[in-house]
A protein has these predicted regions:
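Accessory RNA-recognition modules of RNA-modification enzymes
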Residues: 1-305
Length: 305
């Protein structure tokens, strides 16, 4: 009989679409974060339900050949769910997940081609969104711990461009130097709620968006000075006065530049505002669009909508 707190030796059979290892125990599926297919581990049960179990890793007794050393300084943020899995194996996992999804809707005979991967799956994101919180040391800027609103500082990130990380540090330093209050989500007080940065990978243009609770922004000139030696194209104050988890409000105030940046997908140029949707992985967006164009077999005489 499974009981919370009891430990069991298990074999991991597969990965879920959320990146959790899945085994079986007491005729029920058992889900454990951080384990890979083919691994054996000692696991402690943390949740017992009639139809499933959850556990946490106690000891990895037999690692997978596809397990790679941890490269991330922010292991608790939950942003890279299959981080321990070697990249070629991640691509195979994605292919199998698509195949499985098709099978579930009666399309199992559909051919799923191998996933087109990146040359280097690091520092590829063109957008970063950070939460801002106060601490005894002053303002902290980072990510939320998985399944919580606890803040983890983000002094580095393997999938973000290094300029995002530097902008994070500059804004945090400005807030600490001038004692600018971070947003308190319980009391709904403070000044700075969030920081968002965007980079045009082809244009090189850089956007900084500071999300504030109200229209007041103290030490504005000092913020501009703190960013002056970085290639910031535009700086925008976004005002979000609502008690909500939504990051951006509807009102923008441009402090530097035009309030937008530009970037290209193939030969098409896009104007990107703080509220714009734009694919976060620009190099793979090019790959995706190229493959779509290849499959369309266009001759140049068509009108495409």
């Amino acid at each position: 009989m499974p009981l919370v707190g009891h430990q069991h030796q298990i074999d991991i059979l597969e990965l879920t679409d959320k990146g959790d290892g899945k085994g079986r125990l007491f005729d029920r599926p058992l889900f454990v974060e951080g384990l890979l297919p083919g691994e054996q581990a000692l696991v402690e049960l943390t949740e017992v339900k009639p139809n499933y179990l959850h556990g946490k890793l106690v000891e990895l007794t037999q690692p997978s050949a596809d397990r790679v050393p941890d490269f991330c300084p922010n292991t608790e943020c939950g942003g890279c769910q299959v981080r321990p899995l070697a990249y070629p194996a991640q691509l195979k996992l994605k292919q199998s997940l698509v195949q499985s999804a098709l099978e579930q809707v009666g399309l199992g005979e559909t051919q799923v081609n191998p996933i087109l991967g990146m040359d280097s799956p690091f520092a590829y994101r063109n957008k970063a969104q950070y939460a801002v919180r106060g601490s005894e040391a002053g303002a902290e800027i980072g990510f939320y711990r998985k399944h919580s609103h606890d803040l983890i500082t983000a002094d580095d990130c393997a999938v973000q461009d290094s300029l995002h990380v530097e902008l994070n540090a500059r804004v945090r330093g400005w807030m600490r130097e001038h004692d600018i209050a971070a947003y308190d989500e319980v009391a709904h007080t403070g000044c700075v709620r969030n920081l968002m940065t965007r980079k045009g990978f082809k244009s090189g243009e850089l956007m900084v968006v500071l999300v504030t609770l109200g229209e007041a922004l103290p030490f504005e000139a000092e913020l501009l000075a703190a960013l002056a030696d970085l290639p910031v194209t535009t700086l925008v104050q976004n005002i979000n006065e609502v008690r909500t988890n939504r990051i951006l409000g509807d009102k923008n105030r441009v402090l530097l530049g035009s309030g937008v940046i530009r970037d290209k997908i193939h030969e098409l140029e896009f104007e990107i505002s703080p509220l714009s949707f734009f694919q976060n992985n620009p190099s793979q967006t090019d790959v995706l669009y190229s493959k779509a164009l290849e499959y369309c077999e266009l001759t140049g005489s068509e009108t495409v909508f």
